[in-house]
């Protein structure tokens, strides 16, 4: 990573204008998984959503949700 | 001339608490500069009101001393003065409110998309920072813990209760989004010279947008009681030039991936 790292991250989302971004992180995670369900696991279009939720959500939350998805107990509209 | 500049303009700005400090730390972000300016605006009116009230008080005590003025007057109304003492304070309140609301709403405006997201996660009793903009999978984000350096291990020139082993490295003059949360009990992520204090609530992600305008090292402390070592979980933000940011982050990445 010698050259300039491109500085890009999840953009500000007008659906979540306030300080509390919990729902923003959750929504991006769900959008990614709905995108992969609709377009297939290998689709590159969904990578955008993946970057967004990884930027916003703490790693522990993502791990917990992944486990919940695997065990079928994920509390969200996937 | 240049020597003079060198002597006087390289005095380091106040970015950490100083002993017997009276005023704010030096501003490193537009928000903090706005807060300091608002403070100066309000302080002006404060002095005006203080001098006026003290003058009236001293004058009343002096002229209406019982020895000099034995008979008290019984005045219960005075329409003019009542109108004036209602109008003037409301005008002064308006002069205070205008810059105050302007600052309050501009602090929440996110005009420019942030370039970086950094997650600050509070634990008992240390901080974890995650820089996850560069992952290609769910693992691998740059994550590190930040513990206070205990007093025995401090080197000469370091500040007691303020230094940490791993600082949060950020690029200067770049819009940052900091997401603050906690993994156990409420904490608060505060850096006074950046004008930031944001509660770290478990189960909630609080977002703050800052733009650090100058390079430097900024210190802060946990601002929400979180157990025995609440006083021993400081925060240190190091703003580096944008072009050095990449190499600093990857230097931190290398030892980390060795452990992770």
Curated annotation (Swiss-Prot), chain A:
Subcellular location: Mitochondrion
InterPro entries xrefs: COX6B-like, CX6/COA6-like_sf, Cyt_c_oxidase_su6B
SS bond partners: 25-57, 35-46
Motif (Cx9C motif): 25-35
Gene3D superfamilies: Cytochrome c oxidase, subunit VIb
Tissue: Specifically expressed in roots.
Chain positions of motif Cx10C motif: 46-57
A UniProt-annotated Pfam family: COX6B
Membrane as UniProt keyword: no
GO CC terms of this entry: mitochondrion; plastid; respiratory chain complex IV
Domain CHCH: residue ranges: 22-65
Keywords: Disulfide bond, Mitochondrion
Chief place where the protein resides: mitochondrion
Function according to Swiss-Prot or TrEMBL: This protein is one of the nuclear-coded polypeptide chains of cytochrome c oxidase, the terminal oxidase in mitochondrial electron transport. This protein may be one of the heme-binding subunits of the oxidase.
Family statement: Belongs to the cytochrome c oxidase subunit 6B (TC 3.D.4.8) family.
Protein known as: Cytochrome c oxidase subunit 6b-2
Native source organism of the sequence: Arabidopsis thaliana
Organism ancestry: Eukaryota, Viridiplantae, Streptophyta, Embryophyta, Tracheophyta
